[in-house]
A protein has these predicted regions:
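Active-site beta-loop-alpha junctions of metal-dependent nucleic acid enzymes
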Residues: 119, 138-160, 176
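RNase H-like polynucleotidyl transferase catalytic core
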Residues: 74-80, 167-171, 185-204, 219-224
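Basic, flexible linker segments flanking DNA-binding modules
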Residues: 6-103, 198, 253-263
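C-terminal domain-tail junction helix/linker
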Residues: 16, 178, 185-189, 211-280
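Acidic/histidine-rich, metal-coordinating catalytic segments
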Residues: 162-177, 195, 252-253
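Conserved, non-catalytic sequence blocks in retroelement Pol enzymes and Pol-derived host proteins
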Residues: 37-39, 99-101, 116-117, 171, ...
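Mobile genetic element proteins and their domesticated derivatives, centered on retroelements
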Residues: 1, 8, 30, 45, ...
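An active-site-proximal beta-strand-loop segment
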Residues: 100-135, 141-142
Length: 280
């Protein structure tokens, strides 16, 4: 037809047959996006398509999703793995109402379980709160301090954070034990903890865990420890960090956001995460 991709999808003068062909083409593109991000909703789909050069209105996108029954189905919540019944020191919450506006300003940490055929294995992650990038992770058959320590060591080795970086976690014993807090102190971190029993206090890492589980682990039915150690690292490094769009990052993936932030004036990349607020 001699039209650009964006014009092609927006042209009101095309025939009925051409429109059907367009719908089928869009269906294919939506399904390709959903392969990597099964829970992607209407708004995020619009931004994924836009990055491919396709301009389409939300009304038409909704029509196509309904026409081809492409809606994603809500999934159940998963259980947290926090062990807060311990005698280690509890630290104050340092990020409540904090203006978060830089890389390596706040790191958050969390643990979760992964159900496989013969039991459970466990994942620990460290996230840069400003960019949402997973900067450290570890997988283990045991949920202990070594799992959390290895994820932290990876993050420190990769980022070489400045002294004064805040490390925020829930009140789990893995993050407040002597080995862990000593490593934080040695590297100049300020330690911060969530308020007791507050489900919103560490919502960013919980949201990430949900993404990992429902966009990858549950979707592809990991059955063995080998499945997890072979596939999950690739999803973290190649899909989540490099491809998953975040509305709070101006609809950019974490790694791309960090690269642009490093090369541009930071005022161009202020995000909604700047002022977290909590109901305590």
């Amino acid at each position: 037809m001699g039209l650009s991709m964006s014009t092609y999808y927006a042209d009101p003068k095309i025939s009925r047959a051409e429109k059907e062909e367009q719908d089928a083409d869009l269906r294919g593109k939506i399904e390709q996006i959903r392969v990597e991000f099964p829970r992607t909703g209407y708004r995020m789909l619009l931004h994924h398509l836009k990055r491919q050069g396709i301009k389409i209105g939300e009304t038409r996108l909704r029509r196509i999703i309904e026409k081809f029954n492409l809606q994603f189905k809500p999934t159940k919540r998963f259980v947290k793995t926090t062990d807060s019944n311990h005698e280690f020191e509890i630290y104050p919450n340092l990020i409540e109402e904090l203006m978060i506006d830089d890389i390596n300003q706040v790191w958050t940490a969390d643990l979760t379980y992964i159900r496989i055929e013969n039991g459970f294995i466990y994942l620990a992650v460290i996230i840069d709160l400003f960019s949402r990038k997973i900067i450290g992770w570890q997988i283990s058959k045991r949920i202990d301090r070594f799992l959390a320590l290895d994820a932290l060591k990876m993050a420190i080795e990769r980022r070489n954070p400045p002294r004064g970086t805040i490390h925020h976690s829930d009140r789990g014993s893995q993050y407040l034990c002597d080995d862990y807090t000593e490593l934080l102190t040695e590297n100049g971190f300020h330690t911060s903890c969530s308020a007791k029993g507050n489900p919103y206090d560490n919502a960013w890492t919980e949201s990430l865990m949900k993404t990992l589980k429902y966009d990858e682990i549950y979707m592809y039915e990991y059955k063995t420890y080998l499945n997890v150690v072979e596939k999950l690292p690739k999803f973290i490094e190649e899909v989540y960090n490099k491809k998953r769009l975040h509305s709070s990052l101006n609809y950019l993936p974490p790694e791309e956001f960090e690269n642009k932030f490093a090369n541009k004036n930071e005022s161009e990349y202020q995000t909604n995460v700047s002022r977290p607020s909590f109901r305590l």
